Amino acid sequence: MEIQFLGTGAGQPSKSRNTQAIALKMLDERNEIWLFDCGEATQHQILNTTIKPRKITKIFITHLHGDHIFGLPGFLSSRSFQSSDEQTDLELYGPVGIKDFVLTALRISGSRLAYRINFHEIDSAGKIFEDDSFEVHTDLLDHTIFCLGYRVVEKNRIGELDANALKEAGLPFGPLFGKIKKGEIVQYEGKTFDPKDYIGADKAGKIVTILGDTRKSNVAVRLAYGADLLVHEATYEANESKMAKAHGHSTTKQAADVAKEAGVNRLLLTHISARYVGPLVGQLVREAQTVHSNTFVVKDFYEEKIG
């Protein structure tokens, strides 16, 4: 699992930072990419990456401020230009109003999509998705409008198969190995091969928390609890706490406080005000690291493997 930042700015695009969009790449786990927010020009940012729009199967919108949604109509339309045999439906999660925004933009512009969008409008906290390998939880953050944070939980994966031990026990390599890997007891030439004897302990799944705009809050701590990675906004430097509170945002140290209280492993800071460029970005990093050492301020196109 990898994360890539397509836009890391706050409020409006700048020469160095586009508006908010984050790609959670789950190609090895499920051959999919999940997109979190879709600010203006997200599709242009994607052109500078290896991301294929058809691989984006889910979009999670944190809130309806323009710097988080103005790229949606364009991206959704361009995604429709793929060949018909590559079309896949898309799941779109977000606050109440996201469906009206998207459908109105498509209708007024005369845009027709070659795939279906399944809308999931969220008005309360809870689990919004679950399958055999992942689940997603959401809760309400403390911003100036209704705003969500998302907690992506990978379920524990089955442990490694000890192929050498199976061979030494007399089982030839082949389809029977696959059955044991699936947890099936296998009989072969009078011998019983029990999966519990040949499969190691389950591997703990990863936890990734991606928050929308927010003041420091207990909800943010709960969503991030024990996460391998927390993505938190840091619109302002540490000494601008009053301004951050007034505008529904966080400072570097407040974001780091959340990470520390939640026991997070890695903290990545985004949603950076355009006032912070050059050496000032280093100042933001140092401020946060005084509270949570494993912290970094990301820039557009920054990519990192999780865990």
Swiss-Prot record:
Cystine pairings recorded for this chain: none
Lineage of origin: Bacteria, Bacillati, Bacillota, Bacilli, Lactobacillales
Residue sites binding Zn(2+) 2 per the record: D67, H68, D213, H271
Domain of life, source organism: Bacteria
UniProtKB keywords: Endonuclease, Hydrolase, Metal-binding, Nuclease, tRNA processing, Zinc
Note on how the cofactor is bound: Binds 2 Zn(2+) ions.
Cofactor: Zn(2+)
One Pfam family of this chain: Lactamase_B_2
Top enzyme category: hydrolase
Stated name of the protein: Ribonuclease Z
Key word Kinase present: no
Substrates-to-products reaction catalysed: Endonucleolytic cleavage of RNA, removing extra 3' nucleotides from tRNA precursor, generating 3' termini of tRNAs. A 3'-hydroxy group is left at the tRNA terminus and a 5'-phosphoryl group is left at the trailer molecule
Binding site for Zn(2+) 1: H63, H65, H143, D213
Molecular-function GO terms, alphabetical: 3'-tRNA processing endoribonuclease activity; zinc ion binding
Protein purpose: Zinc phosphodiesterase, which displays some tRNA 3'-processing endonuclease activity. Probably involved in tRNA maturation, by removing a 3'-trailer from precursor tRNA.
Catalytic activity, EC: 3.1.26.11
Protein encoded by which gene: rnz
Family: Belongs to the RNase Z family.
Active site annotation, chain numbering: D67
Keyword Signal annotated: no
Subunit-level organization: Homodimer.
Organism the protein comes from: Lactococcus lactis subsp. lactis (strain IL1403)
